[in-house]
Amino acid sequence: MVSSTANTSEQQILEWVELNPKLDLPIAGTIIRAKDVEILRHWIVPGLFEGLTFPDVEITLQETQKFPPDQSFVLATDRHAGEAQIGEDGSLKNYSAGQPFSHEQIKAAEPTVAGIMVGWNQNHRWQHFGLDARDIDLIYLGSKQNDAPINTKLGLLGQGSIDRLITFDYRRVYLNNLSMLAGREYRVEIEDAETLFFKEFYEFTSPHNVAGTRFLVERKLDQHADDQVNIYSPTERRVRRYSARERADPVMGSNFTLDDVEAFSGR
């Protein structure tokens, strides 16, 4: 987990969005090392870029690839092209399904608005009904410089150290804006679909001091509403609402708040 993202301000991000680099990216196959990494600054968002500035960094640039979405997503994008709009508050208006904004719309927009369009496109990319992943490792890297490799099983082949390793199961289910459900108003036919965009579940399985901790996150269709978060704590043996104060605190011993983890929401 890269702590530099926690020290990056909104203003730095906005200034980066407004940059218009005159240089072309290096060609595919180029190997970027510490002495060259500065040439990537204009192309990598602040916070992430600083996480790449270490002595042994080695980045091999690859050819861009295409990962075509499901045909239903393509059809929904074409059917509703030009309908979605960005509100004065950055909210997404008049959106049904498919990709909200075309590349042409993004290129023609003022930089800040273009960035918001990209955010909404990311949220509403093709994701089927969601994601179900088991045994995900959260690796908290430390400041000690132990000999390489840190942990071959985890794919950490460089120097450094692990401060903490947490394992969890994760599920997210989308209830609305589903392009493959065109005949059902793009929504799942359950009661929660009246108010929710998605439901998300985390269950931490190790180490023992966090095992059994569970988060249930509900993102509402109302873009101005906060995510509703309920947490089950095995030490308290009860379910409770995640408070506003807790939302502003680092989650599970990381440098990130829960809102950081949940990413762009338009608020």
PLM feature spans:
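Acidic, serine/threonine- and glycine-rich low-complexity intrinsically disordered segments
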Residues: 200, 213-267
